[in-house]
Amino acid sequence: TYLANNSKEADSKSDANVLISEIVIEGWEEHPEGRKLELAAYDSMSIKPGSIVNNQLLKQDLDAIYASGWFSGVKFKAEDGVLGVKLIVKVVPNPILKQITIQPSNTIITKAFVNQIFDKYYGSTLNLNELQDRISLIKKWYEDRGYSLARVSGPERISDNGFIQLKIDEGIVSEIQIRFIGADEKVRKGKTKEWVIRREL
């Protein structure tokens, strides 16, 4: 029986229908909040025991488990059984969130404020959707203070230790150059004095 065991295979053209007799979630057993994560993976899936599935449905469920935000890795594996196919879902849970740090350390936003934003999430499994929501709050904090160019980015990959570093580029303007563009879109000598324009900035 063909069954996708990763997203690349799930995109293949094989459309064989397969009866799923059992679903087993693996990879959560050693995690402090393992049972919650097992249920989160199962609840994200539309496939249940007794479902007849193909690669398209498997791909949808693979994406849905990722979209829950609790996992940094998901793979499907299949084992043939007497009553159908046993679907094994191997998950890699995100770590328990322990600390958020900001880089560089001399930003105008305080560590205390960042900790306040994340306070209720410390000690719980990191959820990437919640992380993005919190990052949006930090961006809004900057926008509310006139830093419209500020950028906040999360980590490129999640480490196992639960320490997350956010990179903040406050978008501080270091220089302003004034040019006068004519109707022909070429640079011209302006009639307005440059100091008058700078005064209004």
Predicted regions and their residues:
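Periplasmic polypeptide-binding modules associated with outer-membrane biogenesis and secretion
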Residues: 2-201
